Curated annotation (Swiss-Prot):
Name assigned to this protein: PHD and RING finger domain-containing protein C126.07c
PANTHER family: PHD AND RING FINGER DOMAIN-CONTAINING PROTEIN 1
GO molecular function: ubiquitin protein ligase activity; zinc ion binding
GO cellular component terms listed in the entry, alphabetical order: chromatin; cytosol; nucleus; protein-containing complex
Record field: compositional bias (Basic residues): 346-356
Zinc finger regions, PHD-type: 122-170
Transmembrane segments: none
Matching SUPFAM superfamilies: FYVE/PHD zinc finger, RING/U-box
Length: 571
């Protein structure tokens, strides 16, 4: 009962955080909560420490949200508009009061102030595009275009009126047209009126041409200032950057906290996967039952073959082995001479096949030998095949199956080649090399250590080896040996960073290109090399766009551009 009446204060680490002041929110009654981590401006009053809840479900300090509502009525986290605020005692605590919020309209701070474009007042030479050397910068009296005296090959500033080449050309064409029309209008009085109208029309067209020229000059000056504003912007940032470290760090923390909270709220709930049981009809069910019966029969055959192999082990290769014909005669003699043998034993004796009469004795012996060896190989091959079916299909089982298959093929042909005549042998099996001393017939006898040894033994001249088996084994060894060498941790440069670096390099190279110090191909080559070197420095951590090290990038780029120009001049 005491535990229910006096709840213990929760751990401050598990409490929520106010996104506005970045301090913990009380998750228990205020008299039991430690307010030392809250700023003094908030903890001075109980109403400021209370929790303000908005309709979107986010919690803030009431004091912080009141200050926020003076500017905007949107949630600081999800930007949802709200017109009402509920005040609680603590997070998920009892309701205390509520108050309305007025709808706020955001406005631009300097909307009433006129915008002054300083770049439009700058006069630049139409030919070279520069505004320096103002003492020799001439303004045309007709179209207000600016020209340097050295750009027009003039020795000094003219005292009388100055007209640009464009205006001179227009005036010449106008005078020529007027003179031709005046000469033609001398024939009559009516023609003179037409010449006056044509002259007025030409003057109007000339004025319109000059107006368009002024407009294009203003646009050109604005574009020039916009393209060359990056370097000056970084120079201004270099002076103001140390004073903004604290505020930028606080803003970064707020943005990161808001992002984490939004990810937690928008995290999708994983639904359990529904496993559908396949529906089978009567014919499919009967087929599966037949398949199970066949597998059961194969397992019984495998057990019988295993017992026979254990009771009658194969003699070693070092001992003397009898031929199948001698074994057959010995069994017949034993059953005939043994007085204790019964009729039941004679009925259980394995019947022998009658030999086909042949003129050659060796051919008959080889035929009997082939029959016996084929029966033995069929039994052992069937046993190994059933064991491979019962066991799971892995690379090790496939390897043992290929080894056993190779052994059985080689064993049958090697026994068949022991006869006196080689008439029935093909050239492929006549070149077979002697079989190894021991080849494992079961997948359990083959391990990862001696797998390569067996592959080497079986891959002798004249044998059939599965090339896919050898390739898979070598590929697996190379894959496991070089697995740790493929780990490569490299910091990639983002697309926005590359775009900013490329703009800085372009701005640094443009003056040299306009002065015809470098060609178009050299401009592209220097731009690519400098950008790649800066990308490498950013990846290595030598340069950085964060903190007070931003101004180093523009300085480094200017130095690299100067070095490239100097190397070009030296060459």
């Amino acid at each position: 009962m005491n535990a229910e009446e006096d709840p213990k204060p929760a751990d401050s680490d598990s409490s929520e955080e106010c996104i506005i002041c970045l301090s913990n929110l009380p998750n228990c009654p205020l008299d039991q909560w430690d307010s030392s981590s809250v700023p003094a401006s908030i903890s001075s009053t109980l109403d400021g420490l209370r929790i303000a809840k908005i309709p979107c479900g986010h919690y803030f300090h009431n004091h912080c949200l009141e200050s926020w509502c003076r500017v905007a009525n949107t949630c600081p986290l999800c930007r949802t508009e709200f017109l009402k605020v509920d005040v609680l005692e603590f997070v998920k605590g009892p309701w205390y009061r509520a108050y309305p919020v007025e709808e706020k309209t955001q406005s631009v701070a300097n909307a009433g102030e006129p915008f002054e474009d300083e770049g439009s007042e700058t006069c630049r030479c139409v030919i070279c595009g520069r505004s320096d050397h103002a003492e020799v910068l001439l303004l045309c009296d007709g179209c207000d275009d600016a020209y340097h005296t050295y750009c027009l090959n003039m020795d000094a500033v003219p005292i009388e009126e100055f007209y640009c080449p464009n205006c001179v050309l227009l005036n010449y064409q106008e005078n020529e047209t007027l003179s031709s029309r005046i000469s033609l209008s001398r024939r009559g009085q009516t023609r003179r009126r037409r010449v006056g109208a044509a002259a007025r029309a030409s003057r109007v067209s000339q004025q319109q041409q000059r107006a368009w020229t002024r407009a294009w000059n203003a646009i050109r000056n604005r574009a020039w200032d916009a393209l060359n504003s990056d370097l000056s912007y970084y120079g201004m940032q270099q002076e103001r950057l140390p004073a903004r470290d604290v505020s930028s760090e606080l803003l970064r923390r707020r943005i990161e906290s808001a992002r984490l909270r939004s990810n937690q709220l928008n995290e999708p709930v994983e639904q359990p996967r529904v496993v559908q049981t396949p529906v089978t009809n009567a014919s499919e069910q009967q087929a599966w039952n037949d398949f199970d019966e066949i597998l059961h029969a194969n397992s019984s055959v495998h057990s019988v073959a295993t017992e026979a192999t254990i009771s009658n082990p194969r003699p070693s290769s070092g001992r003397f082995q009898q031929t199948p014909i001698e074994e057959h005669h010995q069994q017949d003699t034993r059953f005939v001479n043994d007085p204790n043998s019964t009729s039941h034993d004679r009925r259980q004796k394995r019947p022998t096949r009658r030999h086909i009469p042949c003129s050659n004795k060796s051919s008959g012996s080889s035929t009997v030998l082939g029959n016996n060896s084929s029966s033995k190989s069929e039994n052992s091959f069937l046993a190994s095949l059933i064991s491979n079916i019962n066991q799971p299909s892995t690379s090790r089982i496939d390897t043992s199956f290929m080894l056993s298959l190779q052994h059985e093929i080689k064993n049958s042909h090697s026994e068949a080649s022991d006869g006196t005549s080689d008439v029935h042998l093909t050239p492929l099996f006549s070149n077979l090399s002697p079989r190894p001393s021991h080849v494992p017939l079961s997948p359990r006898e083959i391990s990862n250590d001696n797998l390569d040894d067996h592959l080497i033994e079986l891959s002798e001249p004249g044998e059939i080896v599965d090339n896919h088996l050898v390739n898979d084994t070598s590929m697996h060894q190379r894959r496991t040996s070089g697995r740790h060498d493929l780990v490569h941790s490299s910091k990639k440069v983002s697309y926005e960073t590359k775009y900013r670096i490329e703009r800085l390099v372009n701005a640094a190279l443009k003056p040299y290109y306009r002065e015809a110090k470098i060609s178009k191909d050299q401009f592209a080559l220097f731009n690519k090399n400098i950008c790649r070197s800066v990308y490498t420095a950013l990846s290595d951590g030598t340069l950085s766009l964060e903190g007070p090290q931003q101004h180093k990038i523009s300085k480094t780029i200017r130095e690299k551009v100067v070095n490239c120009i100097q190397s070009l001049s030296n060459d």
